[in-house]
Every structure is written in C-alpha cells, then in structure tokens.
Regions:
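Generic recognition of short, well-ordered alpha-helical segments
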Residues: 30-31, 63, 82, 86, ...
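Conserved ATPase-coupling elements of RecA-like P-loop NTPase cores
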Residues: 5, 56-62, 79-82, 104-108
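Nucleotide-state-sensitive switch-loop elements of NTP-binding domains
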Residues: 1-66, 88, 147
Length: 150
C-alpha cells in the first residue's frame, strides 16, 4: 500500500513512492518507467526498488534495475536456494538477514552460502541484521562500489 511508501519516507526522510502493479505479483521495467515520471530524476543519485511478492514470481521479470539484491531471512531456512533457484540465480547480492537469530533456528549459514554460490558463482553473499546493524556497512560499501561502475 501507499502506507509503506509513506512509512519509508517518514523514517528516512527519503522520497518514496508506491508503484502500482494492478494486482500483479511483481513490478516490471514498464511500471518503473511510468512511476519515474512522477520523480525529479535529474537530481537522483540512487534509486532502490523493492519488488513485491514471493521468491518465485518477481525473479521472472526485469525491473530495469542495474543490480538485483535479495533478502533471505534466517527463519525462512537455508533450503530456499534449492526450492527457489531462479531468484538466487538472478541476484547480484544476497543478504542473509536476521543473522542475530541464528542460535534460535536450524539455519546453516555456510551451507546456505554454498548453495547460493553453486547456483550463482558471481553472487556476493553477506550476513546482516537489520535489527542490530551488523553487516550493513558492507552492504552500503557494495552499493556504492557498484554505483561507481555505472
């Protein structure tokens, strides 16, 4: 909903808009292009798209993004690369979030990383915790380095 966009804007001070997807399970490059007409893109330094849906549908559609980042959370399980290979194959960066909860779940970080890299040897896999901030500096560094390459 537009509530999510407003929440992001309120918490970060960053302009945020909702892309209307007409009830589909994804956004695509055409939807993004139309949404960008609402933005002053001349002064835009970085655009982050949050696709919707699950680990299947969004992986099948090109959003027009330069890089794809996905989040896998520890509670979801280390088997997700086996169940949803395409999402991991098309991701440049895989963030394994909620790393601060590892002791409470049967999640093998190294096994998950191995499974991801088997599907996509070029992927970067980083452990993060949105709650504690662990690993977020590495994420920011990765984003900034990739941005410089454009």
């Amino acid at each position: 909903t537009s509530l999510d966009a407003q929440r992001v804007a309120d918490l970060t001070g960053v302009e945020s808009i909702q892309i209307h997807n007409c009830g589909l399970c994804h956004i695509d490059a055409d939807m993004v292009s139309r949404a960008l007409l609402e933005y002053d893109t001349e002064n835009l330094d970085l655009l982050i798209l949050e696709n919707i849906g699950n680990l299947v549908c969004p992986a099948e559609f090109d959003t027009g993004a330069h890089k794809n980042v996905m989040l896998l959370s520890v509670p979801e399980g280390d088997d997700k690369p086996l169940k949803y290979p395409l999402m991991f194959q098309v991701s440049d960066l895989v963030l394994i979030n909620k790393i601060d909860t590892l002791e409470y779940f049967d999640f093998d970080f190294e096994l998950a990383k191995e499974r991801i890299l088997k599907l996509n040897p070029n992927a970067v896999v980083l452990p993060v915790s949105a709650k504690t901030g662990e690993g977020l500096e590495q994420v920011i560094d990765w984003i900034m380095k990739e941005r410089e390459k454009l």
